[in-house]
Structures are given as structure tokens and as C-alpha cells.
């Protein structure tokens, strides 16, 4: 019974600690968004939709909405159930087709051949070719060779033979001693 009381009191303390914490409010709150402008048929009346400038969004005029011009001027008739691709290359490259010895199967315009710009060739398809390795210090450090023998010389003294035995202990920079 004693263990149960201790366990339940610790559990109650943990629950109180966890449930009484205040939620952290964000320091940045984005500005409130404007509700979309919804026009009813009474407000629009007979004016074409492209003339409305209440929301200040520039729109290109459409001949279908124009009150005088006929809608036959639109020379581009796009099927809404089909995807179209525009390419900056030759128009012959737009149509992707699979050619075999007997027949040609057209697979449509949804896969342009060379319309991707700024793509990087990482040679994933040919793993035999190695990618260039980065040479900056965190990745592949290049060793730095410092020739310390040119900067340091033996202790300058009249007795050079005595210093040959202690040449490792008496190294001073050349900058200090100028002959």
C-alpha cells in the first residue's frame, strides 16, 4: 500500500507539472489574410469579368469575355483534358515517339526531350565515371608541408662544436638573430 501511495503521488505531481504548463506563443504572427473578393451576379451585371479592377490584379483580356469581339479570334483551341508542353527547342523535338522496325508509337507531348534548363549531370547512370571529390578541409584535406629548418637556426655562439651536441634544444628564430 505504501508503494502505491508513493507511486500515485509521484504520478499526480508529474501530471500536474505536464498539464499546467503554458503554451509558448510564437513571437512572429503573420498579418491576417484578406478574405477573397466574391462577386455576385448582381454586382457584375453585364460587364465582362476582365474589366473588373476592384482587387487590382492585372488580367489579360480574353476574347471570350469581350462584349463586341467574337470568340472565334482565339486561334489556340486547347483541350482541357490533355496536357500540353511548350519547348524552346525545335518543334520536331516536342513529339516524343518510340520507333521500332515495323511501326511508330506516339506517346504524346507530355514528355519533352530537351526542355529542361539548368539541370546538372551527376552521372548516376554511369557509376564507373568518378565524380570530382571536394578538396576543402572538412571533406578531403590537403596536407600542408612547412619547412621549419629554414626559419630556425642553431644558437649563435662562438663555440659551434659544443652546440652540435645540443642542436635540438637551442633553436631560435632567424628573425631574432640578424647577421
Curated annotation (Swiss-Prot):
Residues of this chain annotated as glycosylated in UniProt: 135
Tissue distribution: Hemolymph. Produced in fat body.
Regulation: induction: By bacterial infection.
Record PTM text: O-glycosylation is important for the antibacterial activity of lebocin.
Residues excised as propeptide: 17-120, 153-179
Keyword annotations from UniProtKB, A to Z: Antibiotic, Antimicrobial, Glycoprotein, Immunity, Innate immunity, Secreted, Signal
Compartment(s) where it occurs, according to its Swiss-Prot or TrEMBL record: Secreted
Family per similarity comment: Belongs to the lebocin family.
Job of this protein: Antibacterial peptide.
Protein name as annotated: Lebocin-4
Biological source species: Bombyx mori
Amino acid at each position: 500500500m505504501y508503494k502505491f501511495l508513493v507511486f500515485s503521488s509521484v504520478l499526480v505531481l508529474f501530471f500536474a507539472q505536464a498539464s499546467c504548463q503554458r503554451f509558448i506563443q510564437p513571437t512572429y504572427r503573420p498579418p491576417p489574410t484578406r478574405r477573397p473578393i466574391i462577386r455576385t451576379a448582381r454586382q457584375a451585371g453585364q460587364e465582362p469579368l476582365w474589366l473588373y479592377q476592384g482587387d487590382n490584379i492585372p488580367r489579360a483580356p480574353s476574347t471570350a469575355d469581350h462584349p463586341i469581339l467574337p470568340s472565334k479570334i482565339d486561334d489556340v483551341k486547347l483541350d482541357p483534358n490533355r496536357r500540353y508542353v511548350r519547348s524552346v527547342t525545335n518543334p520536331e523535338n516536342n513529339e516524343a515517339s518510340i520507333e521500332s522496325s515495323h511501326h511508330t508509337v506516339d506517346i504524346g507531348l507530355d514528355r519533352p526531350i530537351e526542355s529542361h534548363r539548368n539541370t546538372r549531370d551527376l552521372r548516376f547512370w554511369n557509376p564507373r565515371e568518378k565524380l570530382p571529390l571536394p578538396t576543402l578541409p572538412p571533406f578531403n584535406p590537403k596536407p600542408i608541408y612547412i619547412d621549419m629548418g629554414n626559419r630556425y637556426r642553431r644558437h649563435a655562439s662562438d663555440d659551434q662544436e659544443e652546440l652540435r651536441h645540443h642542436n635540438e634544444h637551442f633553436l631560435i628564430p632567424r628573425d631574432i638573430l640578424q647577421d
